[in-house]
Design a protein with these regions (language model features):
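Histidine/lysine/aspartate-rich catalytic loop segments that bind and position anionic ligands
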Residues: 105-137
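Beta-hairpin (beta-strand-turn-beta-strand) motif
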Residues: 59-61, 83-85, 107-109, 130
Length: 137
């Protein structure tokens, strides 16, 4: 969201050559947050230029739909928001089956206790310090 998209392929290669071991991408769909960013095709394009795992932060109303349109690779992280209230066990199973890691993101105003019932399927948790959707926040 804060990078020059015209140079992103080269930037990814430069990061990889200099020791980066993971990339992060924010996927926003406009209904869940006030911005619209990258989608599944962009994730696939990133995956095509690197073997580094991609940390996909899904700030979307329908994480199942987005997840069905890009491959989760070994080491990739997929983190939808707890506020969407989906079947996170089924989503986690799909991600784990592909060799990826599953997480949940939590908005600042949401009680962190909301993720308690999913702790047994979580590999990571993202605690948002600002409401999602703000660039560089």
């Amino acid at each position: 969201m804060c990078s020059n998209l015209m140079n992103l392929g080269q930037d990814i290669k430069t990061l990889e050559e200099n020791g980066a071991d993971m990339l992060h991408i924010d996927v926003m769909d406009a209904p869940f947050v006030p911005n619209l960013t990258f989608g599944p095709d962009f994730i696939k394009a990133m995956q095509a230029v690197t073997t580094m795992p991609v940390d996909v932060h899904l700030m979307v109303d329908d994480p199942e739909l987005i997840m069905s349109k890009f491959p989760v690779r070994k080491g990739d992280i997929v983190s939808p928001h707890i506020e969407v209230k989906k079947d996170y066990r089924a989503l986690a199973a799909k991600v784990h089956e592909a060799g990826g890691l599953f997480g949940l993101a939590v908005n600042p105003e949401t009680d962190v206790e909301a993720i308690k019932e999913y702790l047994d399927v979580l590999d990571t948790v993202t605690l948002m310090l600002v409401h999602p959707g703000a660039a560089g926040a």
